[in-house]
Amino acid sequence: MTELTINHTLDTLGLRCPEPVMLTRKTIRNMADGEVLLIIADDPATTRDIPSFCQFMDHQLLKSQTDTKPYQYWVKKGLDHL
């Protein structure tokens, strides 16, 4: 598998819902389309909230690791329409 280029990292360890999603939204708002954000979290609610956020806000959840803590999510700003 090709290694993902990470442009930004957001550490939300210790934060609980809704803070991880609020910080994700704030961070992505300041990113350029196509950039990738790595989100690191330990709140079990993020396993539901981050994928839902991506779908609702039209971002791509490229990859996630939710088997063990800390959870990791790779989110690309915007959607590829090719």
From Swiss-Prot:
Species of the source: Glaesserella parasuis serovar 5 (strain SH0165)
Parts of the chain that traverse the membrane: none
HAMAP family from the UniProt entry: Thiourid_synth_A
Family: Belongs to the sulfur carrier protein TusA family.
Signal peptide: none
Compartments where located: Cytoplasm
Name of the protein described by the UniProt record: Sulfur carrier protein TusA
GO CC aspect terms: cytoplasm
Record function comment: Sulfur carrier protein which probably makes part of a sulfur-relay system.
